[in-house]
């Protein structure tokens, strides 16, 4: 389940950012929302990611944070027919040109996993 690895990376990145904010004198009480950009070619199961994050964030300022996911579509250039645009995706092993069905593609994008931003509550 690679979702657990992604959840761990998310939590670590957010807690590191919070630590930097606290070093500047800002005290963060709670993270309420986390917005992600996730490439479709990562094949991340969002429900499993949310569950894994919920479990590992327990007892931290991230406990109970709402996770929103924006999916990023991959782009391709077909090396056979020259098509440029979105590929057809059946699963992680079958990605092909929608025009000529070739698997000879140059892919770009679709593998991102970014924390776009997080909403926090500060202590008074």
Swiss-Prot record:
Keyword set, alphabetical order: Metal-binding, Nickel, Zinc
One of the GO BP terms on file: protein modification process
Residues recorded as binding Ni(2+), renumbered to this chain, are: 2
List, alphabetically, the InterPro entries matched.
Hydgase_Ni_incorp_HypA/HybF_CS, HypA/HybF
Q: What family does the entry list?
A: Belongs to the HypA/HybF family.
Q: What does this protein do?
A: Involved in the maturation of [NiFe] hydrogenases. Required for nickel insertion into the metal center of the hydrogenase.
Which HAMAP family does the record match to this protein? HypA_HybF
Q: What is this protein called?
A: Hydrogenase maturation factor HypA
For this protein's source organism, the top of the classification is: Archaea, Methanobacteriati, Methanobacteriota, Methanomada group, Methanococci
């Amino acid at each position: 389940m690679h979702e657990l690895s992604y959840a761990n990376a998310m939590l670590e990145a957010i807690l590191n950012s919070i630590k930097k904010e606290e070093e500047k004198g800002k005290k963060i009480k709670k993270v309420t929302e986390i917005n992600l950009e996730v490439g479709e070619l990562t094949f991340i199961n969002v429900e499993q990611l949310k569950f894994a994050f919920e479990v590992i964030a327990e007892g931290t300022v991230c406990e109970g944070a709402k996770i929103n996911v924006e999916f990023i579509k991959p782009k391709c250039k077909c090396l056979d027919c020259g098509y440029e645009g979105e590929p057809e995706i059946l699963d992680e092993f079958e990605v092909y040109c929608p025009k000529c069905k070739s698997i000879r593609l140059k892919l770009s994008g679709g593998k991102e996993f970014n924390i776009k931003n997080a909403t926090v509550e500060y202590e008074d």
